UniProtKB/Swiss-Prot annotation:
CDD domains, per the entry: M20_ACY1L2-like
Membrane spanning stretches: none
Lineage: Eukaryota, Metazoa, Chordata, Craniata, Vertebrata
Similarity field: Belongs to the peptidase M20A family.
Organism: Xenopus tropicalis
Protein name: Peptidase M20 domain-containing protein 2
Gene: pm20d2
InterPro entries in the record: Bact_exopeptidase_dim_dom, Peptidase_M20, Peptidase_M20/M20A_hydrolases, Peptidase_M20_dimer, Xaa-Arg_dipeptidase
Length: 443
């Protein structure tokens, strides 16, 4: 559909409320930028880059915002391939602190597959939603001044760029944050789970495998036992737990007892508490393999742990209401909540500021992390769905900005789900300090 909301007749008529007129203008602004947004997405898609190496995607996005009036750009924000673009409404007085809304862009790709997770579309949606919100606020004055920030967040697939930015203070004064991820359906929430990566290294002793194998200590045997130990463990794992890995190094030649082997595993569970339990069980499997073979084992993690995404029901409900106005058909709540998803460093963001991480259909039933999804993410058909999602995000942001009670409910949801997640029904100073989100701080 075009910039209009369904049923709006294509014009901001007198019957529309001020808020609905703002939403109409947001959708129109996004549609006006459709060609340039498509070019941005296509440019990123056609030149895939791995985590922390997204030089060309970074250049494309920073050039995009530097060419638009009113945006203040920090091209290398905290990380080489991160950026920050800001736009603000005029301050009405010196006492009014602006409501700070964030939109996140991802743009790293997968090894050998390119943009098989559609991060080019995530970048496009984040940029589009920010422009839509800007366009709406240029036509109407919200109750309080507003600051819009677009954060370019590298390295979601490997490393956790958002976690680096959290630690650098990038989210400290934000009230609410938005991003959306491509998938096979529209869903306001899917249970993205907590994830821990572990690298397992076994050190043995080389020897001639035919002449005197008894002199060797076989590190490959340790790796195979470890892999099989994890496979056996799955019988006793909860249905919502996941452990998957590869053997990265298993020796150099058949007639040499391998003195070194290496595995890499990802462990996932619905919550940080459950992830800790799974990690303990997995570590026991790795250590048992070392004991059985006489190898020395070394366990390490190459990056940050990803937290599970905390659901903000108020934001999700508001997003669904706006999405339905645009023709979205959302997955049933029971199906979405009982489905299994992956992991994202947005989960860590959801622990420090209220936010939403919906999923959106792109016109294909292909599965993420496949060659077919790479093709779908770069298709012309995906553009309609990406821009529709951006409109829904911008409209949801407008609801938050123009309805103080809604923002209060968003904050209450955030506080409650954090307390439930932490298993602590008493707000401590530590949890206040770590909340990060300006809108929900105790002050």
């Amino acid at each position: 559909m075009g910039p209009e909301l369904q049923g709006a007749g294509g014009k901001c008529s007198a019957e529309l409320s001020a808020l609905e007129a703002c939403k109409q203008r947001a959708a129109e602004r996004i549609q006006e930028e459709a060609e340039s947004l498509c070019e941005l997405s296509r440019d990123i898609w056609s030149r895939p880059e791995l985590a922390y190496q997204e030089q060309q995607a970074h250049e494309t996005l920073t050039r995009f915002f530097s060419s638009r009036a009113g945006w203040l750009l920090e091209p290398h924000y905290k990380l080489d391939t991160a950026f920050r673009a800001e736009w603000s409404t005029p301050l009405t007085d010196n006492l009014s602190q602006p409501l700070h809304v964030g939109f996140l862009c991802e743009y790293d790709a997968l090894p050998s597959l390119g943009h098989a997770c559609g991060h080019n579309l995530i970048a496009e949606v984040g940029a589009a939603a920010a422009l839509g919100l800007q366009g709406a606020l240029q036509c109407s004055q919200p109750p309080r001044p507003v600051k819009i920030t677009v954060l370019g967040t590298p390295a979601e697939e490997d490393g956790g760029g958002k976690i680096d930015l959290i630690e650098a203070g990038a989210f400290v004064d934000m009230h609410v944050v938005f991003m959306a991820h491509p998938a096979q359906e529209d869903a306001a929430y899917l249970p993205d789970v907590a994830e821990h990566d572990v690298t397992v290294k076994y050190y043995g002793k080389a020897s001639h495998a035919a002449a005197y194998p008894w002199e060797g200590v076989n590190a490959l045997d340790a790796a195979i036992l470890a892999y099989n130990n994890l496979s056996v463990l799955r019988q006793q794992m909860k249905p919502t737990w996941r452990a998957h890995g590869i053997i990265k190094n298993g020796g150099v030649k058949p007639n040499i007892i391998p003195s070194y082997s290496e595995l890499e595993f990802y462990l996932r569970a619905p919550s940080l508490k459950e992830l800790t339990k799974l990690q303990e069980k997995a570590d026991a499997c790795f250590k048992a393999a070392a004991a059985a073979t006489g190898c020395r084992v070394e366990l390490s993690s190459s990056g940050h742990d990803y937290y599970n995404v905390l659901q903000n029901k108020t934001l999700a409900k508001t997003y669904v209401e706006n999405g339905k106005k645009l023709g979205m058909q959302f997955a049933a709540d029971n199906l979405a909540l009982n489905s299994l998803s992956g992991s994202t460093d947005f989960g860590n963001v959801s622990f420090v500021v209220p936010g939403i991480h919906p999923y959106f259909y792109i016109g294909s039933d292909a599965l993420n992390h496949t060659e077919e999804y790479t093709e779908a993410a770069g298709s012309k058909e995906a553009q309609f769905y990406a821009l529709r999602t951006a409109k829904a995000l911008a409209m949801t942001a407008l609801d938050v900005l123009f309805n103080p009670d809604l923002l209060a409910n968003v904050c209450e949801d955030f506080k409650l789900i954090k307390l439930i997640e932490e298993g602590n029904m008493h707000v401590t100073e530590k949890s206040r300090e770590s909340s990060g989100g300006a809108g929900c701080a105790s002050r």
